[in-house]
Amino acid sequence: MIRSNPHYEKLRSSYLFSDIAKRVAAHQESHPGVDIIRLGIGDVTHALPDACVAAFHRGVDEMANDATFRGYGPEQGYAFLREKIASEDFKARGADIDSDEIFVSDGAKCDTGNFQELFSTDIRIAIPDPVYPVYLDTNVMAGRTGEFKDGRYGGVSYMDCTAENNFVPDLPQEQVDLIYLCFPNNPTGTTITKPELKRWVDYAHEAKALILFDAAYEAFIRDDTLPRSIYEIEGAKEVAVEFRSFSKTAGFTGTRCAYTVVPKACRVFDQKGAAIALHPLWNRRHTTKFNGVSYPVQRAAEAVYSTEGKAQVKALADGYLDNAGIIRRAMDTMGFDCVGGIDSPYVWINGNGRDSWAFFDLLLKKAGVVCTPGTGFGQCGEGYIRISAFNSREKVETAMARMKEALGS
């Protein structure tokens, strides 16, 4: 008989953001016409930059003409985009990444979730807590964890991120093989310094481990001393894979374009302990299971690197950062401790003793504001909420005014 994958039965009942959507829908059904301001899921609200829209149109026009029509493209991405990425995102910052080390995809979520397929199921993973749920859930699906008990899965090295360590995880005390890091961080909005990141790179060399570095929010960094890429750190090319996305950088959440960097110098180890290159493994997986991002979308992504595109993308991110500042200042005024909102579009807020879901429900029902309960990101997120800056200035200001009234501040 056909049997299901038993590891799916270990997963908690549903994905965090599905739970949020259900609660919001139930509230709207019982309160028809209520005005909801969504500051929960990290989805952008402003239109694509004009430079990207124009390039998108040109790409579509090419597809409408037999002479310029394109069918299947290279699975790894068109050279015109890969070369721009290598030049503008890496070489310009002193990171020696070549275009053929870049794999264009339809999302960092897919890539961070899929990359674990390259590794043995008996490796030990190190996951920050709180963390973006996809990292952990995909490893549960693959069978790398034990059962879920007392808020955590067995067989996982959880790296607590709390106020005590400024929400930057400490190095593991035990041997781990695969390490997930995300900076600027989702959900806490915190950043990591170059010396802190260097310690992780050194650890990975010593432990023969691999770092999966999610840099989806690097476009929001304004402090020039902070690393935008792990490859700004000496030795990282041998022990790290990096994930980037145009979703938050240029508003591509509904357009879908991202990329993963797998340096040819990066090594993993076979069952006999011999070092082997990781690049051809991901190339094989990528080309077997993915047929490439559409040509017009890649042309739109290329436009991000034009003179006009750079200015428009920066203005877009600056607007969201201004929103984050409004949120953080408002929460400070209301007496809540918070981090993030600087070099990041997320603000991580201590609920002053409130349960995460209780705080979520209070803001939804009394203020009509949707946030994200911190407990959905892990055990260490209990008592916190995440508020996203991805909305219009007007709605963010309205949301803060409503919250102030609802909380009696």
From Swiss-Prot:
InterPro entries: Aminotransferase_I/II_large (IPR004839), DapL/ALD1 (IPR019942), PyrdxlP-dep_Trfase (IPR015424), PyrdxlP-dep_Trfase_major (IPR015421), PyrdxlP-dep_Trfase_small (IPR015422). The modification N6-(pyridoxal phosphate)lysine is found at residue 248. Its EC number is 2.6.1.83. Disulfide bonds: none annotated. GO terms for biological process: lysine biosynthetic process via diaminopimelate. Keywords: Aminotransferase, Pyridoxal phosphate, Transferase. Substrate binds at residues 15, 42, 109, 132, 186, 291, 386. The keyword Plastid does not apply. Pyridoxal 5'-phosphate binds at residues 72, 108-109, 132, 186, 217, 245-247, 256, 291. Its cofactor is pyridoxal 5'-phosphate. GO terms for molecular function: L,L-diaminopimelate aminotransferase activity; pyridoxal phosphate binding. Pfam families: Aminotran_1_2 (PF00155). Pathway: Amino-acid biosynthesis; L-lysine biosynthesis via DAP pathway; LL-2,6-diaminopimelate from (S)-tetrahydrodipicolinate (aminotransferase route): step 1/1. The keyword Transferase applies. Homodimer. Belongs to the class-I pyridoxal-phosphate-dependent aminotransferase family. LL-diaminopimelate aminotransferase subfamily. NCBIfam families: DAPAT_plant. Involved in the synthesis of meso-diaminopimelate (m-DAP or DL-DAP), required for both lysine and peptidoglycan biosynthesis. Catalyzes the direct conversion of tetrahydrodipicolinate to LL-diaminopimelate. This is LL-diaminopimelate aminotransferase. The lineage of its organism: Bacteria, Pseudomonadati, Thermodesulfobacteriota, Desulfobacteria, Desulfobacterales. The gene is dapL.
